[in-house]
Amino acid sequence: MNLTQDQAESLANATNALSNENAAMAKQVGEALKRYGALGQVAGLTAKQTAAMAATLIGAGAEAEVAATGMNAFMRTMTKGGSMTDLQKAAFGNLGFDAKQLQKEVQKDAPKAIFSVLEAIKNKLPKELQMQYLTAMFGEEGARAMGPMIANIEKLRENFALVADETKYAGSREKEFAARAKTTSNALT
């Protein structure tokens, strides 16, 4: 992901804070980042936004590998533009999106584009068509990971907000270490 030492430290603190706010361990989020992080940045997400997305997916029940593969399929499709298949273009078009415009929007503001697509699927389609559209748009791998995201849009929004404000997570690893060091079991060893 080509991060400086300070950026890596900040990402580690953000990942730790995300693990404290989600049913995802920092190790799992880190594994998803290792698999997908660099591609997320190419697709328009920051490393911390990618971590937030991974934490949301893992918290919704996805394994780290499934989360990484699903994010890859999801973001790769969103950045295809005119290279989308006819089926993908039709599915996005039915929801009011133009493939080339969406490609530009992802690069301009990836979280906004992600929310607009997820909310369109959730709000414009009956539940029985949502997985069908997710599969048509993002393939089996993308649909498998992103299906649970539809039900967790607000959690994703909270996670993006958390990583957007470094004051919310700065030093979180050190604080957690200090808290654990004060426990009775640690004091006895």
Question: What would you call each of these model-derived segments?
Answer:
Residues 1-21, 28-38, 46-189:
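Alpha-helical architecture feature
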